[in-house]
């Protein structure tokens, strides 16, 4: 069985992330969205909250699972029997970063990195940008994040203002 892991901090999951998940689910027999924690960024949602939100969004994709990922991606992949890492590329800067990480991952384990190009409408979306414009009161967040996440995002950002 071809199993892929799509790792990320997903704080929050964006429409760009969701597009990569959907496309990967058409390529691999099973896709596991690995919810990690980026220690260099202040998280808006806990890993458990992110897992719950993402699970709601992908519920109609039968070969997609969501799990909390601790430690190195390659360690998690070994635990779940995955051989492929899926990553999305928005631009050349992403490519440089992902190329370096792919090299490190393949040095650590027998894994392949599969890079999917972001569709033009998603090339400028990042979780950091979504949080920034959301904190400034943008009301059309559904352009950037799945509808099921918009309310949770607005609530959390409003709670931070208090």
From Swiss-Prot:
Coiled coil: none
Broad class of where this protein is predominantly found: cytoplasm
Catalytic activity: (R)-4'-phosphopantetheine + ATP + H(+) = 3'-dephospho-CoA + diphosphate
Cofactor(s) needed for function: Mg(2+)
The protein's name in its UniProt record: Phosphopantetheine adenylyltransferase
Biological process annotations from GO: coenzyme A biosynthetic process
Molecular function per GO: ATP binding; pantetheine-phosphate adenylyltransferase activity
Gene, per the UniProt record: coaD
Native source organism of the sequence: Leuconostoc mesenteroides subsp. mesenteroides (strain ATCC 8293 / DSM 20343 / BCRC 11652 / CCM 1803 / JCM 6124 / NCDO 523 / NBRC 100496 / NCIMB 8023 / NCTC 12954 / NRRL B-1118 / 37Y)
């Amino acid at each position: 069985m071809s199993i892929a892991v799509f790792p990320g901090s997903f704080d929050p999951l964006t429409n760009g992330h969701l597009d990569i998940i959907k496309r990967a689910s058409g390529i691999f027999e099973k896709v596991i969205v690995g919810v990690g924690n980026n220690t260099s960024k202040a998280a808006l949602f806990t890993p458990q909250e992110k897992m719950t939100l993402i699970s709601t969004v992908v519920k109609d994709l039968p070969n997609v699972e969501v799990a909390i990922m601790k430690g190195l991606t390659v360690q998690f992949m070994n635990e779940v029997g995955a051989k492929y890492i899926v990553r999305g590329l928005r631009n050349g800067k992403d490519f440089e970063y992902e190329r370096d990480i792919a090299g490190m991952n393949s040095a650590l384990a027998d894994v392949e990195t599969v890079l999917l190009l972001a569709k033009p409408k998603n090339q400028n979306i990042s979780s950091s940008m979504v949080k920034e414009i959301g904190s400034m009161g943008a009301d059309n967040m559904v352009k950037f994040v799945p509808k099921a996440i918009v309310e949770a995002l607005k609530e959390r950002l409003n709670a931070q203002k208090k």
